[in-house]
Every structure is written in structure tokens, then in C-alpha cells.
Amino acid sequence: KDNNDEIKLSSLIQPNFTFTYDLIECELNENSSLLDLEFFFSKNVNKYKLIISNAVELSILFPEKNTNVSEFIIAIESNNNYESLKTFVDQIQIDKFNNIAVCEFIINQNNGFNILEYNKSFNPDYTLIEILTCEYNQDFNYGSFQITIARFINYIKKLDIPYSLSYVQNKSNNGFIWINTFHDENYEKILIDNWIEGEEALEIKDEFIENASCIESNVYKSYQLF
């Protein structure tokens, strides 16, 4: 009974969400190239800035390891701006974006917050994002997971690496999206040297696995349009 009460109590704990997040998956048409995509956005970006309020960040994500890129994601961080996002989606279709790529224009407005922000200077032209799609294990939730998150953050802060972390709640299931952002192209070496082999790091990873299972992980190069 006590354990059930703990589960019920932990399920009541929710993060202090500060933004909404949408990932729009796209695929280039066979007769289109990345140059076409770049030209389209450079031609229209100022118009889209006017349509979408200042509280919105829009980035294009390309798979990191894939040299022949045909798939990409439009990532939009906003603040419950459903109407302006809908206006943007309508306008991008009016501008015949479908001549360049086919996209799943679904606006989910999943709630998110930044667990850790890296505020020191870094190369703004290089941002690498790892998106993990995760589900909580049975009897686990954000309330039980936040202890592990706090321990992870304390550890990462001591390493002082160019890294940010965001948490996005998945409305469609008992899950979340864990977004690692690396601000240095040598991120793999930095992680191996500072994080992967440490004893405390292994303990934190075990706690993570106890709370949740991540069913998909993808790494992208991110280019922020505005």
C-alpha cells in the first residue's frame, strides 16, 4: 500500500513547463535538393518571422551521419502559439513548399522545459542535437525520475562541458523526448573523456534505465533560422 501511495504521489509532480515544442518530419522530393530548400527559406524567412511571434524559434534538423540527405525535421519551439504556428503552416503551403518536400504538418504543442542551459560562449554555427524518444517503465513517472535528473545535472555541471538539455512531454503516451544539445563538434570525445566511463555516471545511467526505456535515438545537425 505504501508503495502504491508513493506512485500516486509521484504521478502528481509535474515539471514547470516553459515552452511548447513541435517536430515536423519532412522528406525532399526526388527532383529537389538541399540547395532548393536553402533557397526557399532564404527567400521567405523574413516573411515567416513576421507571421510568427518573437517568442518562436525555428530550426532545420538534418541527420548527422547521412551524406545523402533526403529527410529533415522542422523543429519549432514556441509558447502555446497554436494560431501563429497554424498561420505559418498555411503560409508555407501557399508558398508551394510541397514542390520541394513533403511534410507531416501536425501541430502537437508538446510541453517542454530546459533542464540545463549552456550560457557560455560557443560557436553558434555548430549545434548538434540528439533526440531520444523514451517511455516511462511501469510505476515510474516524472516525479520518480526527477531525482535522477537532479543527480545527472549536478554531475554534468561539474564537468563544465558545452552542453544543454531539454525535456519535452509526449502527449500521445506515457513518455517524453530527451533532447541533448552539444555546442562543440568534438562532443563525442568530450563525452567519452568526461562522462561515459565514470563510476558515478554509470550509476546515474542505471537509475535512468530503471525509470525509463528509450526506444529511439537520432542525431541531427541543427541550423536555426530564427
Where are these regions (language model features)?
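Short S/T/G/P-rich N-terminal loop/turn motif that feeds into the first structured element of a domain
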Residues: 1-202, 207-226
